[in-house]
Amino acid sequence: MSSTTPKRSEPADEDMEVEVKRSKVETDPKSTQRKYEDFKAQMVTLANQLKIDLKVKHNADIIGSIVMAACTGNAIRETGKYSFFFNDEKDGWKLREVELNCKPVIDWANQTLTDEQKREWYPFLASLQLCVKTEDAILWQRNPVTRELQVSPVCEPFATGYNIKDKLKKSRPLSVGPLNHLLHWVNLQTEKSVGKGRKLSPRAAAGIRKRLEATLMRQTIGQSQKAMLRQIFDGKLAYVRTLAHSYCSIKPHIENQFVLPYSVIAVTDSFENADMSSEWVYKKLCEASKKILLTGPNESWKTFMAQMLIYCTFRCLHEDLGVLTSMFGMVFEPRKSKGKYCKSSELQVLGSQEITYKFWSKPQRGAPRNLGGARRGQICTRPSFRGVRATYNQYSSLEQLEKACGNPTSENVVEALNAEFEDTQNSPLKAQGRSTKGGLPMSTKATSRLQASFCLKFSLICVCNFCCFLSLLLGIC
């Protein structure tokens, strides 16, 4: 008989929110390596019980999500029923429901993730969950944040991370889109609940608001945008739409990390020298792609599901598709071309597809100031990779942006924003670091040639009709 393991004790809301402590800076170069190794070890422990093949992406995703749930204190059953693919000699790969004993992983998490260890583990787990939840955001395109804020879905690139746990959002606040923090702040104005009937005390609510306000001010780089934020904090919520749409041109600060998803972790033999920013990540993804058996509705989805590994690893779901095409040497398919995704029970094993890269770049960490959406391509992009690229600003004023989005400017207080829009538009190129070819850094001259070629390639590739604007919900088009 299955039983539910209670969640590990958490600090009181008031203490947790008012006295938020910074995550411990990891100075140990082996820290990321050990976390990958420990996480994989727990995946293997679960899979070995029933000889579940972790090369199958669906299997690895289910096992990985169980380990993640145990690590983050979710109430999961010690014995639960899950569906995995098993290879039958007669019928090939078939889904079969089995009972899995999760208690060993639950016990490991309870012993390992003490309050002290959470400060070291939660930033890693937050980055990992941001990575794997990217797939849900792409496949289902629910856009809950923009819908609740009542702004155009064109702003969804700045709501990234909406679907990860709140306790993990606090560990990587600058990696979560500012619209998430803004929605949380707005909701606190009318609702003091933290779920399941629990109410926040006034002191705890004030602590949360203060933390959210500080994060939003750090992520917002335009001075006029900051002034608008102060107006919102004073209760003038009519400015929310205007601020959200201004992010489409004056991009906010959203930090990115490169993280291996569950399916790549499962088939990686060595995590030596692991990090979240170098060519190591590219190499491990390419090596793993030869082993991973992709799953999807049918064979026509195979290339798209291979590209899904890229989207998740580099969190580049809102990146310019021309940039991705230049980097990985394959044409990236728009989400709208694939139609509706299927139920888990209708998945098929599609086999493997090798991923290669022509050059690599480090993750984008600062705010990409001079990067608008391509005028004839994606309505709005959010760069994930550092590098020089051309800018094709979609709009020359906030009024044009809001007119296209169907939202009138709340009040006539956007002159400063329009001036910043103009400054942004007048800068055709913006350096954000170096792109690197093959495996070794190149000379400045070689890098410049690559950057010029890089800009030309994606400028030519990103050509499609502007009238598809309303259908481009997530910028993956």
From Swiss-Prot:
Predominant place of localization: virion
Which residue ranges run through the membrane? none
Q: Which GO terms describe its cellular component?
A: helical viral capsid; host cell; ribonucleoprotein complex; viral nucleocapsid
Q: Where is this region: Disordered?
A: 1-32
Name the source's superkingdom: Viruses
Composition bias (Basic and acidic residues) maps to: 18-32
Q: Where is the protein found, in the record's own terms?
A: Virion
Give the GO terms filed under biological process for this record.
symbiont entry into host cell; viral penetration into host nucleus
Tell whether Metal-binding is among the UniProt keywords.
Answer: no
Keyword line: Capsid protein, Helical capsid protein, Ribonucleoprotein, Viral nucleoprotein, Viral penetration into host nucleus, Virion, Virus entry into host cell
Write out the similarity annotation.
Answer: Belongs to the influenza viruses nucleoprotein family.
Instruction: From the Swiss-Prot or TrEMBL record, give the protein name.
Output: Nucleoprotein
Query: Which organism was this protein described from?
Result: Dhori virus (strain Indian/1313/61) (Dho)
